[in-house]
Amino acid sequence: LESNLIPIICIGENAKDREDGRALEVIKKQLDESVPKNSNKNNCILAYEPIWAIGSGKIPDNSSINEMLNMIKGWLSNNKIDNSINILYGGSVNKSNAKEIFSCINLGGLLIGGVSLKPEEFSEICLMAN
């Protein structure tokens, strides 16, 4: 933050933590350890990116994404950190699932990985954002 760079802080659980019902606990710990207390929407972006979803073609359902986004917003408020910080979703985003993901509450955008290397598909996702 002191260098005037805006970090995207990626947080996410692995498959075992998710299966064991520890996803929320893991994400809270990651937030505690990685989000500076002076963070705000002008100097920080958060991205929920479940590790198990990256490159797998699988994503959590919208209910799970919403639960995580709401928990992150609550964590920001509880820690007296600007809760208008954008929260992105990343992890196997593609043109087939982007529209549904965009419908999530508290979503500030998408963190797009491999599909960003496919100009036509990436453009379609960008159009969906409008």
Protein language model annotation of sequence segments:
Residues 1-130:
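Active-site loop-to-helix "anion-binding N-cap" substructures in soluble metabolic enzymes
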